[in-house]
Amino acid sequence: AADALLDSSSPDPPSGADGLLLLADGTRYRGRLFGAPVIAEGELVFTTGMTGYQESLTDPSFAGQILTFTWPLLGNYGVHSGASESAGVWPRGVVCRQLMEVPDHRDSIGSVHDLLFAHGVPGIQEIDTRELTRRVREHGTVLCIFGPAEAEREMLVRLDEMTPPDAEDLVAEVTCDEAVIINPGAVDKEGKPLPRLAAIDCGVKHNILRELAQRFEVVWCPATTTFDEILKWEPDSFFASNGPGDPAHSGAATTARDSLAAAVRAGLPVMGICLGHQLMGLAAGLRTYKLRYGHRGANQPVVDLETGRVYITSQNHGFAVEDPDKGMLAPHPSGACSARGRNELEAPFKVRYVNANDRTVEGLDLIGKRAFTIQYHPEACP
């Protein structure tokens, strides 16, 4: 896990090091640096969670991004063994109002500064995150860079030459290396073998795998694994996980989408969450598009259109599936979206869930197939 790399020899936060955060729109903020002594660049996003910062920092869905925490204090209870969602820290940089440099919890094994330093990730504090978040909400996510104030000239050049992380094959960066059964021979309470599920890893979190392993014998597969290769494991069902980046990217995500579509056509049970939901939407012939500022936090309300019930969900995504009737809701000013394709699933579908805030699509049901999707993270871990 990410916390396994904590090193008590990491230097104290450089309290006197002046930092500079530069946005592509020309806005600048001054603060103090912590974490690794390197320059960070990426897409500026924010998360509204009040706790769960360790889980967010180790969530592969944040790959390629500069993560702003809207809650004004970061690191109060330190870093805990077993709380990480992957083996890495995935944001390329962290922005906060105030860092708790000496955490206060009996089970803490280190600080956020220690965790970031161990993984080569920088942070900047004393930023007006309230104003910064309002700017992102009003104008959309934006490219940014931060580092030592004396490196301003270098950072301006790099910011001018920066390409959006969405253009990168981020799924290939975060997926596992090879297929493996994580709980071989798993049985239920009566000793009967559990059904086998192929979990396509687009950036899956550990808590999702743990939940699946309580119900299935799980084959953990790289996103680059083809449908025919997965079939060699003789799965009873398919699952596609959360993950970072543009679902329409022509890399590992495309291979995962093709595997899902083939599984649906073969009549196998299929579930997609977060990026997996978006890949299924693309396979259904819908467009995916970039949201103005995305949904990132543990308090996103989702409406079940069949029952009228509202669920408070944990989410982390910057893209959405278009509504087949209403089109693209809450889009990014850039207008970034995929082309509309054909329905590769060979089945009609309906929108089952929508976001109560902006009415964007939060889940699809495939009619006549054992397949469905949800945009949120059902294990409810930030």
Regions found by a protein language model. Give the residues of each.
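Catalytic beta-strand/loop cores that center a nucleophilic Ser/Cys/Thr
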Residues: 309-368
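RNA-binding accessory domains that recognize and position tRNA/RNA substrates
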Residues: 1-233, 245, 254-255, 379-382
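Cysteine-nucleophile active-site neighborhood
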Residues: 232, 237, 242-323
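Proline-centered loop/turn at the N-terminus of a beta-strand
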Residues: 122, 196, 269-271, 287, ...
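A glycine-centered loop/beta-turn motif at secondary-structure junctions
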Residues: 363-382
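Active-site-proximal beta-strand elements of phosphoester/diester hydrolases
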Residues: 196-201, 313-314, 372-376
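Residues that mark the start of a beta-strand
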Residues: 194-198, 217, 269, 312, ...
